[in-house]
């Protein structure tokens, strides 16, 4: 078959192929079982294969690259406008193929297996942190029903209250409640141990990667943030500028301009929420500690704080840090504070 471009609709078991030649004539439209996919593409001459950036897309992108094909991943929201008629696999594959023909189409970079492994650690850690927060809130709520209130916020205060209640003699709570609190305490300690173990694994990965080590010199960037940014961004040279990288993270203002009048709103919040959250949390810590410092960055932050709310300043610093991280990753240079 004389194929120049293929749209491949991914699934668990049945894949849909839509292929066109260099004249945009349809020359292939068929279904493939999962076991047939590699053999089908192995028999084809090298061509452009486009897929939606969905579950297992990076795996199949790596597999098809090994077979000599050029692979492009497209975000689903950019494919949807090209779907004709009702949604089914054949229309989806055709839409993917059509979207890949657009000269201005934006593509998702293919991640390596190592990048996905690091991201998996971050995803699991994030889920465990959410579970720990929910459990702490549950413990505080249950104890509050018996008039036992923590005087401070945070995990340490919750655990201290829990241990105080369990150690008090005579027991201030009914016997069934005491047994329940022991189970909740064990569950909370298990979550703490699992989170700590994952953080040690992430830190070990950071220590073994000189590229990530360079990111730690930026104020507001710790091992968790540096590891997550490096794993998600991959080759930062895919972004032409630092502003494009910040926009990819959703840290630039949303724009609604017309007739030459520029109107900027809140940040767009596009892209990876987890990465954006880490950068803003790190920036917030820097903003909180800048009051008594005299370096250029602290003076800049102090000036902003006189005009804008602290959270706005934190987002501005997160934007600046994102641009710095892009420069360090794309140019493979060390951070030199201004």
Swiss-Prot record:
Name the record gives this protein: Probable family 20 transposase
Pfam families referenced in this protein's UniProt entry, alphabetically: DEDD_Tnp_IS110, Transposase_20
UniProt record similarity statement: Belongs to the transposase 20 family.
Entry function: Required for the transposition of an insertion element.
Protein keywords: DNA recombination, DNA-binding, Transposable element, Transposition
One annotated GO biological process: DNA transposition
Organism of derivation: Pseudomonas aeruginosa (strain ATCC 15692 / DSM 22644 / CIP 104116 / JCM 14847 / LMG 12228 / 1C / PRS 101 / PAO1)
High-level lineage: Bacteria, Pseudomonadati, Pseudomonadota, Gammaproteobacteria, Pseudomonadales
Signal found in the keyword field: no
GO MF, one example: DNA binding
